[in-house]
UniProtKB/Swiss-Prot annotation:
The active site is at E104. This is Stimulator of interferon genes protein. It comes from Magallana gigas. Sensor of cytosolic DNA from bacteria and viruses that promotes autophagy. Binds c-di-AMP, 2'3'-cGAMP, 3'3'-cGAMP and to a lesser extent c-di-GMP. Nucleotide binding has not been seen to stimulate NAD(+) hydrolase activity. Keywords: Autophagy, Hydrolase, Immunity, NAD, Nucleotide-binding. 2',3'-cGAMP binds at R256. It catalyses: NAD(+) + H2O = ADP-D-ribose + nicotinamide + H(+). Pfam families: STING_LBD, TIR_2.
Length: 415
């Protein structure tokens, strides 16, 4: 096994036939593995893996065989992943471009983090390398499948080994949960409950009706690096003031002040839109730890920690309706992007929220999964981009997959 990065490995030699017992399945698992693959390009490879694994006594869930016609919906896939002890991710150049495959990867990562077990087995095809993978998958042990399938025993060994926790991949410990709970109780729980009222008051006084969402925009740069001001992102973004200050006695600090900033952003037509927005400041700690070698936090581990932070914060907010509908997390890739990318992203988010607010539509976020954190429901670490996605971006043979604002998937069949 050749080491490739801090915790990523590629198998480059065949493993001789192994004698191993088949693990006993316990509730809720009814399969040893769910096999995720791109149906348009990789079915034959996936079926060869299926035959090899099941010939050794393992039970797999394989969509082409086990799902009824018309049954391959997002809900069915989520249930199948949850009922599987492991997920074998067959990853090829095609699957990295497939919205359905990226959805399955995201659901597998989410389920793995929920149970805190490293139960994902990335199998790489077609020259895919670790650095090509979505960031949350890069710390995992990867298997580079040989053209003659001689090393399928590596896959069998991977799904047979004792379970590891995610903490075993994170030398600095689990930062994410503490950061998320601290951010919620120490900040969001204080400023969000009445935020929509103060925003409505500000936009009425400042003649911003129809050009400002009621939500607080929380910006989440992929690098976790937070600038001093959002206006530093582009000359099209300007500081315009702040909402009324909230004063609260807190942790020995008398009359501690909480202040939320208002910005404007200019769209392609030269019209100004307004938003209350800020970076999720706590994640900047991870960026600073990454820069300091003594902390032991490396870039790939930072990606895992940041996703765990997001998922934990999402679950916390989902239990608090008073807060969850009053903020919008906006994830974006902040490296090698043009200067007008951020303003376009913000304008699109504001206009999307205004449409929802004007129609009182809070049920479905009609932005596909290839968007950069379109709502507090679906981070796509597979291909983060500032490009504003639309239904025309979806490949015809792929499903339109959407999530509700609550985070639940909406069942949409493959097209």
């Amino acid at each position: 096994m050749e080491k490739n990065g801090a915790h990523s490995f590629l198998s480059d030699t065949p493993v001789t036939s192994l004698t191993m017992s088949v693990p006993v399945l316990r509730h809720p698992h009814v399969y040893h593995a769910f096999i995720s693959y791109c149906a348009d390009a990789d079915t034959s490879h996936a079926r060869t893996i299926l035959d090899s694994v099941e010939s050794r006594g393992f039970t797999c869930c394989f969509a082409e065989r086990d799902f009824l016609p018309g049954e391959c919906t997002s809900d069915v896939v989520v249930d199948a992943i949850h009922c599987s002890k492991n997920v074998i991710l067959v990853i090829s150049p095609a699957s990295l471009q497939s919205e359905w495959s990226k959805f399955e990867m995201l659901m597998a990562v989410d389920d793995s983090h929920q149970r805190n077990n490293v139960c994902l087995v990335p199998v790489l095809l077609g020259g895919v390398k670790v650095d090509d993978l979505p960031p949350p998958l890069r710390p995992l042990t990867c298997i580079e499948l040989m053209d003659d399938f001689r090393n399928t025993d590596d896959i069998i060994q991977a799904i047979s080994k004792p379970e590891d926790t995610w903490e075993s991949l994170l030398p600095v410990g689990n930062l994410a949960h503490g950061f998320a709970w601290g951010y919620y109780y120490g900040y969001l729980k204080i400023i969000l409950p009445d935020l929509d009222k103060t925003v409505r008051q500000w936009r009425r006084v400042n003649n911003a009706e129809g050009r400002m969402s009621e939500k607080l925009f929380l910006f989440f740069p992929q690098s976790c690096r937070c600038r001093d001001s959002i206006a530093d992102e582009s000359s099209l973004i300007k500081h315009r003031g702040h909402l009324p200050i909230i004063t609260k006695d807190r942790a020995g600090i008398i009359e501690r002040q909480y202040k939320n900033t208002i910005y404007s952003v200019t769209d392609d037509n030269g019209e100004d839109y307004f938003f209350a927005g800020e970076y999720i400041g706590v994640i900047h700690t991870m960026f600073e730890m990454e820069q300091n070698a003594t902390t032991g936090l490396q870039t790939r581990e930072k990606y895992v920690q940041s996703m765990r932070f997001y998922l934990t914060l999402k679950r916390i907010l989902d239990t608090d309706p008073e807060c969850s509908k009053k903020c919008k997390i906006v994830f974006y890739k902040d490296v090698n992007n043009s200067s007008d990318a951020m303003p376009k992203l913000i304008c699109n988010e504001i206009k999307n929220q205004l449409r929802k607010e004007s129609s009182d539509d809070t049920t479905v976020c009609m932005t596909p999964f290839n968007s950069p954190f379109p709502s507090i429901s679906s981070p796509d670490f597979a291909r983060c981009s500032l490009k504003s996605p639309s239904s025309t971006n979806m490949v015809k043979s792929e499903p339109n997959i959407y999530r509700e604002e609550s985070g639940k998937t909406k069942s949409v069949e493959r097209g």
